A protein has these predicted regions:
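Collagenous Gly-X-Y triple-helix signature in extracellular proteins
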Residues: 1-184
Length: 184
């Protein structure tokens, strides 16, 4: 799999001393994301719910507990835990913070604005602000890919990036692409 640098000094470190001593910015140096998606599609949850938001979804657990373990050990040892924000789901506008090693991007981090998600889930990454493509492939074909953002006005959906690269949303038990990010 290929990864692209999507930002520098963008993500807030969960621990100010993640590099051994406090950093001047409190930010992770480099943020990366998969250029395309994993070859396997995943559901956010086995049922159509976004209750509990990103913090309570099955895919977050899979990323942290399974997929991270499949990365090269040299990578695992340098990945930093960062604080990511997302709404609490179930149409809540409350923004919660989560400590993550691997994460999905929020709608605003990709598009720079919110169409289907709650306000306050982060800021647009430089990679996307520069106009780079939002289309990602699963096994060579453009596909929908998951965001960590719960749908703001319904309790069954999470936000996705449509196969054409535009903002959309879909049922939480849909099986879509995963293009995770991480920081070093």
């Amino acid at each position: 799999y290929a990864f692209v640098i999507i930002g520098f000094n963008h993500d807030t470190l969960a621990s100010a001393t993640a590099y051994g001593s406090a950093t001047a910015t409190g930010k992770a140096g480099i943020s990366l994301q998969m250029k395309d998606c994993l070859n396997t599609t995943y559901q956010m949850n086995s049922s159509n719910t976004n209750s509990g938001g990103w913090g309570n979804c099955a895919l977050r657990t899979t990323l942290q507990n399974t997929i991270k373990g499949q990365l090269p050990s040299a990578w695992q040892s340098i990945i930093k835990t960062v604080t990511k924000k997302a709404s609490a789901g179930s149409t809540s506008s409350t923004i919660s913070s989560y400590s993550d090693t691997l994460f999905l991007l929020a709608e605003v981090e990709i598009f720079g604005s919110t169409t289907y998600s709650a306000v306050g889930e982060g800021d647009q990454y430089a990679w996307y602000k520069a106009g780079n493509s939002k289309v990602k492939k699963v096994n060579g074909s453009a596909n929908f890919w998951w965001e960590r953002s719960p749908f703001a006005t319904g309790s069954s959906y999470f936000c996705i990036v449509y196969s054409a690269g535009n903002a959309s949303s879909s049922y939480a038990n849909g099986s879509f692409g995963v293009a995770f990010g991480f920081c070093v």
